Amino acid sequence: MSTYTRPVMLLLSGLLLLTLAIAVLNTLVPLWLAQEHMSTWQVGVVSSSYFTGNLVGTLLTGYVIKRIGFNRSYYLASFIFAAGCAGLGLMIGFWSWLTWRFVAGVGCAMIWVVVESALMCSGTSRNRGRLLAAYMMVYYVGTFLGQLLVSKVSTELMSVLPWVTGLTLAGILPLLFTRVLNQQAENHDSTSITSMLKLRQARLGVNGCIISGIVLGSLYGLMPLFLNHKGVSNASIGFWMAVLVSAGILGQWPIGRLADKFGRLLVLRVQVFVVILGSIAMLSQAAMAPALFILGAAGFTLYPVAMAWACEKVEHHQLVAMNQALLLSYTVGSLLGPSFTAMLMQNFSDNLLFIMIASVSFIYLLMLLRNAGHTPKPVAHV
């Protein structure tokens, strides 16, 4: 049986279109807020509102899938995100955008959970790794293309919203031509997310997802603002964000192979150390292109390696619940990161963005170094 079946290919095709829309908005919303003369802390709170929506969407989607299945859940998630896009044009203001970014965050998280769970249920223990790799590649390619779009098209609010909303609705079309079955859902209902979060042997993986959320949430939410305050144009900001994301794309396969060959603990240690080096390089303002590249290559691949670490510690029937727990952990980190970092930037300096990233990475590195590497034999492979 082929790994990349027709339902899988159509699902990933729809995800690509949705990711394009998500990437464009994630880059431009902080800039639109800055153009409305909102303070840095307000920009951070709006970013956190989006990630709060992610948190709510992650918690709700399991129930939604159980009630209406993968296909209808996917349609619903896409419509919710489209509403969050279109709503930004109704009224420009802090409270209005706080609400609509929350709605968009709910829809976005629902899309992620539906797609990830559908891929898990479509695969087997032998091919889930390839499915997850394909998912991450599509996600980052979509994000990369979205950043390039920002550098090539008009970034005016009312110019962007119509085609971004259209892209979101177009992402529904591939799933109209196939049906993703939920054959294994009943087998996963008995495993709770809470029990996965409390699993001692998977704690480094869970902590890694939290740290990854803090790092990537801060980069996505506040990096455009950091560059804007440095006098970089909107088009150039799109280019630099594309450099950051392209590094994450290029790093996926080699880092995954290194993790399989040399062990995930060693690779996680090296990744976190490189994130610290990249942050220091950004603070020194020396050679921004190499600094952003190594920061992207290490930071954007931290989540899948940490996720693989945690998933290999659980039984086969616990994989979906563990995946939900890890996404929840990532979302919590994404919620806390931009909000706290934005307050530091507002009160002290924009450089606190990279000081914060380096600090939380150093804390995680200490956790990894405390582990002697004598971990239990893996019981499941994703």
UniProtKB/Swiss-Prot annotation:
It is a multi-pass membrane protein. It comes from the Bacteria. GO terms for cellular component: plasma membrane. It is found in: Cell inner membrane. The chain crosses the membrane at residues 14-34, 45-65, 75-95, 102-122, 131-151, 157-177, 206-226, 235-255, 270-290, 291-311, 325-345, 348-368. Keywords: Cell inner membrane, Cell membrane, Membrane, Transmembrane, Transmembrane helix, Transport. InterPro entries: MFS, MFS_dom, MFS_trans_sf, MFS_YcaD, MFS_YcaD-like. GO terms for molecular function: transmembrane transporter activity. Belongs to the major facilitator superfamily. YcaD (TC 2.A.1.26) family. PANTHER family: TRANSPORTER MFS SUPERFAMILY (PTHR23521:SF2). NCBIfam families: PRK03633.1 (NF002962). This is Uncharacterized MFS-type transporter YcaD. It comes from Escherichia coli O17:K52:H18 (strain UMN026 / ExPEC). The gene is ycaD.
